[in-house]
Amino acid sequence: MFAISGVDIALWDIVAKNSNLPLCNVLGSAGIKKIPAYASLWRYENKEAVKDRCSSAKNLGYNYIKLHEVFTSEVRAAREALGEEIPVMVDTNCPWTKDEARQILNSWEEFNLYWVEEPINPPEDFESLSNIRSESLIPLAAGENACTSFEFKKMFESEAVDYAQPSVTKVGGITEFNKVVSISQSYGVQVMPHSPYFGPGFL
């Protein structure tokens, strides 16, 4: 899918250049002046480091901050550093079983998280994600590992997520990404695009 995505992205780039327009305008974003961004931090597994990096991100003007922590102590440290006014997301990178995720998310409800991302392994276990979502007060996000709009449709049909995160370099390129956006609207799921940090994303 990386290769297909790369070819599709290149074709869209050709269309934009032939039109003498930025690709964002070709895709219909004319008039949009600002796009909200969040600070995506490393995994530190150290409370003081988390506090320091969260405070730095806040001072730089970020109004949303994403952690990559899996331990409660670091999530608590982030909330202590940021207060209640800054939304916090946690990307866990598929570390737990369904039962482990259920238990941990239950203990994290006190932190008023914006979402928890990919809490279980394998990430395409949409049935387990749906079960966790139905029992948790914390919204769930997933999708960076999903390929094609067909897989996202299965995700939405399972009611597995609140936020879908297609990666343009994995899902099949811009064409398939747009299909995911269209399908997500039918199911009332919000799209939060994943950053394409490898594969064709290096280009």
Which residue ranges define each predicted feature?
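Catalytic core of soluble alpha/beta enzymes
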Residues: L67, T72-F198, F202
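N-terminal capping/lid subdomain adjacent to the active-site entrance of alpha/beta enzymes
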Residues: M1-M89, N93-R102, N106-E110
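Adenylate-forming
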Residues: L41, F202-L203
